């Protein structure tokens, strides 16, 4: 277990964990051709160099070098509706619990639009062996609430990106069987900000102020630490963290019209460093010192099939399983070994199923369509910072060949998330004398429009 000078970092990374386009903070947008079929058949289809990101064994199907670059723009529309209340528990008061303040927890469009880039290259070495390299984003999220948001202790700003750099090789074992193996270096950035919100109003209450005067530091000066709603109470920023993993794949081609593929991507541990933390944990509300936390990006397995039914029509499908239960809890301790943080996450393993079809209209134009169902990972414990939900994908796409070597992929997907109701609770203070309990009740609604564009070139 890593040791900490402050418990902030564990708090921050708990909060930095979805959006309308992925379970928890996993992203599916590795290519535009895949977007057009709702990423059905990803481990079995080899229509461009993006196979580097899905199943490296598919590189054995290429006869010439392939290059692909582009990205997907994710236009999320996630709205939060609800209320937030702050209560003070004053042990020395005969009134016991008193409601101090109430406010709105509603906010619109809390996840801003984001561009998810990709870049791939595949080079056959001979009839049996091929090499590939790629850059894509498998995990990431961003959510933003106003600085003066009443439920700022739950909202604020969260920004996590993890750029995956991959080197892969593929080997054709027999005419039908191919194997692939790759190594991954993940470059990650994280920024988390939380604000006082309604807590700043609570500590201005005269009874609370009186109770604060007999507290130990730093609670004694809590009203001075939190002068306004936009006061930062949680802060983390790390712009350069690395993690490493591997991936493997197998592909079996029964004939040119039928193949199946299985791909596995290992977990990746990202070591974040917090150098100047701020925390509102009990008795810790000041700048912290250096601390570390390892966040695990989960491993996942995908099984896919591709079947060319006629000269023009093909169908494809996928089942993807992500091992989110690796993130059951976050633990941290101070340098002296005392517990700083122990939080249950209750993430659940999730499944994604997809079905798609491709139609070769003529030699230049290929059309695609797909549908998918993606299960939420945070089904038992949700967060305003991560408005995760079950979602359904509806996708359309096309590839147009300008020349035998140059083509462009276009893709669109509409994602509709289920309405979700949940509650978040935060307590600060000393339970022996004074605590401030903040509770927010939320209803979240999410949908998103995804637009993709990729250019492909065959040498």
UniProtKB/Swiss-Prot annotation:
Gene3D superfamilies: Outer membrane protein transport protein (OMPP1/FadL/TodX) (2.40.160.60). The gene is ompP1. It comes from Haemophilus influenzae (strain ATCC 51907 / DSM 11121 / KW20 / Rd). Residues 1-22 form the signal peptide. One of its GO terms (cellular component) is cell outer membrane. Belongs to the OmpP1/FadL family. SUPFAM superfamilies: Porins. GO terms for molecular function: long-chain fatty acid transporting porin activity. It is found in: Cell outer membrane. InterPro entries: OMPP1/FadL/TodX. It is a multi-pass membrane protein. Keywords: Cell outer membrane, Membrane, Signal, Transmembrane, Transmembrane beta strand. This is Outer membrane protein P1.
